[in-house]
Every structure is written in C-alpha cells, then in structure tokens.
C-alpha cells in the first residue's frame, strides 16, 4: 500500500490584483518549489506573488508548459506550515468543486494509509480502501506491505501527442524499504 500523504499543494496567489493558480510539483530546496502556474504568461522571472499575509514568493525561473520555479519568503518547516495553512487539496480536473474545494476534500482525498507527506496528487487506487475492507482482507490471509510513491501533478496532464513514446512523463519520488522488499519477495 502506498503510504504517501497528499500536500495541500494548490495555491492561489496574487500579482497585484491579478489571480494566478499554482500547483506545487516538486520541492527543489528548503524554500524553492517547481510549480504549474495558470495563467503562466503572467509569471516572468522577478514577479512577486502574494498567497497570504504570511506567504509570498518570487518567480525565479520559467519553463515550458506553464512550469515556473518559486522562491518562497519562508523555508523549511515554516514553509510547510504556511503551505498547509494556505493551500487547498489538488483535486484532479474530473472532480468539480467551487474554487478552493471544501473541508471534506482534505480527508476524502487521502488514503487510509497516508503517512509520509510529499504527494501532490492522491494515489487513487488506494482511495477505495476502508478499515473494514482492510480487516476483511487480513482475515482472508492477505498481507499488507507499504511503499512510498509521492504521486506528482503530471498525473493530471493529458497525453497531447499522437505517438505515445513522444509523451513526456514527469518524475515521481519513491521508496521501497528493505522490510517491504523482503515481504514482497517472500510472497507466493
């Protein structure tokens, strides 16, 4: 089971009075994140973005396909707390919500195995598990092992090419512990 926990990685920022939506993709350092910006055309290097009274960022780089690099006004644990306080759950496009979603999304868009913060999208295959289902599977002899795969926002992107091998995949971070590897290797 994937034990990743989804971050509140959807941020609404303001450049002057103009609104820009950001989806955090990948942390580059203690205070720097790669993110999708919409609309990205307003995010040139040097652009100041205000997310809240306590959270600001500067666009330090801009890439293709709406990706930008943000340097935040705080770092480390303070940045994590500010993102958690300011951000919303990054729901996939097929889940329609008013801007910002609702409080229930914070709970319902996590799997019951969610533990290690880092995903910017839920491992949707695990969303249907409930404690009751897990208990029934354990009673039937199933064995559970945990891996961590921090699902990235690339999972939201459509395939826009005719030839599948031309599609650019985004990277994701994963970890399989020695204990989990041994349990998988021992399974029949």
Give short role names for the model-derived ranges.
Residues 1-188:
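Surface-exposed, charge/polar-rich loops and edge strands
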């Amino acid at each position: 089971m994937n034990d990743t926990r989804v971050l509140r990685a959807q941020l609404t920022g303001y450049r002057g009075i103009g609104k820009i939506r950001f989806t955090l993709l990948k942390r580059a350092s203690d205070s720097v994140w790669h993110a999708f910006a919409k609309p990205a055309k307003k995010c040139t290097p040097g652009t100041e973005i205000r997310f809240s009274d306590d959270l600001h960022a500067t666009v330090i780089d801009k890439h293709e396909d709406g990706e930008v690099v943000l340097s935040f006004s705080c770092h480390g644990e303070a940045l994590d707390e500010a993102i958690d306080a300011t951000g919303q759950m990054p729901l996939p496009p097929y889940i329609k919500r008013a801007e910002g979603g609702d409080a229930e999304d914070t709970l319902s868009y996590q799997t019951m195995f969610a533990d290690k913060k880092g995903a910017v999208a839920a491992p949707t295959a695990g969303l249907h598990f409930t404690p009751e289902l897990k208990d029934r599977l354990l009673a039937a002899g199933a064995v559970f092992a945990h891996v961590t795969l921090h699902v990235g926002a690339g999972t939201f992107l459509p395939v826009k090419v005719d030839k599948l091998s031309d599609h650019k995949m985004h990277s994701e971070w994963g970890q399989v512990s020695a204990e989990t590897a041994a349990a998988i290797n021992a399974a029949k």
